[in-house]
């Protein structure tokens, strides 16, 4: 989700930078650091995923559950902590952001709910087949 946020909202739409309380240069640097961290996490996750495949230990239902739960947690953390509590940045500037905030956090809740639902189903299926 960090990659989607970084690419779409930071680079393509230019709505904000990760850290907007300073100069444009600092904002661009903060975007680069965020993108670097997100990319390192993605590569590490790919190695972990490949290791599960190699060991034939991948449980696809649990993997999808974790994927959507992670998307939702990231979205809500960004919307609540980064946008509202720390005020690192807002979704947009020079507009009423209320609708954007509701849409951003609602999307996070939907993703989180989907992840939790998939987790419950995966656990039930694992218990039934064990």
Enumerate the language-model features and the residues they cover:
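Membrane-interface capping segments at transmembrane-helix boundaries
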Residues: 51-55, 118-130
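Residue-level detector of alpha-helix boundary/anchor positions
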Residues: 22, 66-69, 92
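Membrane-helix exit/interface motif
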Residues: 11-17, 44-52
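"…centered on the first transmembrane helix and the immediately adjacent amphipathic helix/loop
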Residues: 2-36
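Alpha-helical transmembrane segments of multi-pass membrane proteins
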Residues: 1-2, 70-78
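Membrane-interface loop-to-helix entry segments
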Residues: 25-47, 96-119
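Interfacial segments of alpha-helical transmembrane regions
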Residues: 56-73
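Interfacial helix-loop-helix junctions of multi-pass membrane proteins
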Residues: 7-19, 79-99
